[in-house]
Amino acid sequence: ENWIMGEAGSIAAMVRMTGDDATSMFEMITIEEVDGSLVLHIQQWDPGMVARTDGPQEMELVEITDNSVKFKATSEGGMSALGYSHPDADTFIIHVENPGRPVFDIPLKSRSIWK
């Protein structure tokens, strides 16, 4: 998950999910300032840029703290809520809530793309 620095009222991320020497999914996330709050849009693609849905899922801000943010879905999609936290300088945690399932966390560690 790679985030582009915020500028002009927006921030964006590109995600690539890999495993077993193959890419299984790409994801684009944007967060924009809208009417004094934040709106998140998220969309996923299979390899070959085959969209998994007709369009992005939209979420609205429900909570923000010094080191976390949480959004809830306002349109149809795979998630009912999505959050992020940054408990320390090297850790970034994605909090995913799917309908009818408990929240699961995806902890990420900082790493260089220039290995």
Regions found by a protein language model. Give the residues of each.
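Central antiparallel beta-sheet cores of small beta-barrel/beta-sandwich binding domains
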Residues: 2-75, 115
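Edge beta-strand at a domain terminus
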Residues: 59-66, 86-115
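Glycine-centered tight beta-turn/hairpin loop motif at sheet-sheet or coil-to-beta transitions
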Residues: 76-79, 99-101
